[in-house]
Design a protein with these regions (language model features):
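N-terminal auxiliary interaction/assembly segments of multi-subunit proteins
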Residues: 1-150
């Protein structure tokens, strides 16, 4: 992965969380945030000038906050709506990331977001993968970008 891709992932992810979910990243990722396990995730595959997938993983407190902020809801939100809200965030984030990677040049096709099984989460990085962790008052999120080699 090129350094320019690495540079673009964090600011693009942070801006998407801010603009779509109204969650504002912490200045520094704390030890407490890093210790929080991921309890939910979505994966969005894409193809076009570059192909791969983007994963968004989140700790327990993040998804209710995303859902409440995106839907303007107060209090407990249906688990299916939480899954849908995280999927929509993953979809928008994927679109923003692929556009930033290619400076808006080219057409990309995104597959629908798919829920991920937390039992399958790994902290190990794969070849051609970039990963950023983002801390929030509500917990932390992780964005992982996998590019296919072709």
């Amino acid at each position: 992965m090129t350094p320019s891709t690495q540079f673009q992932l964090y600011p693009t992810a942070a801006a998407t969380f801010e603009e779509l979910a109204m969650l504002f990243p912490s200045d520094v990722l704390t030890e407490e945030q890093l210790a929080l396990p991921f309890t939910v995730g979505v994966s969005v595959r894409f193809y076009g000038p570059k192909s791969g997938r983007l994963e968004v993983r989140a700790s327990e407190g993040i998804v209710p906050a995303i859902t409440e902020n995106m839907l303007g809801a107060d209090g407990a939100v249906d688990p299916q709506l939480q899954t849908d809200a995280l999927g929509e965030l993953g979809n928008v984030l994927c679109g923003n990331v692929v556009s930033a990677m290619t400076n808006g040049i080219g057409v990309f096709h995104l597959h629908p977001p798919r829920p991920m099984d937390p039992a399958q989460f790994s902290e190990l990085l794969e070849p051609n993968e970039e990963c950023v962790n983002i801390g929030f008052d509500e917990g932390r999120a992780q964005v992982r970008l996998f590019l296919s080699s072709r």
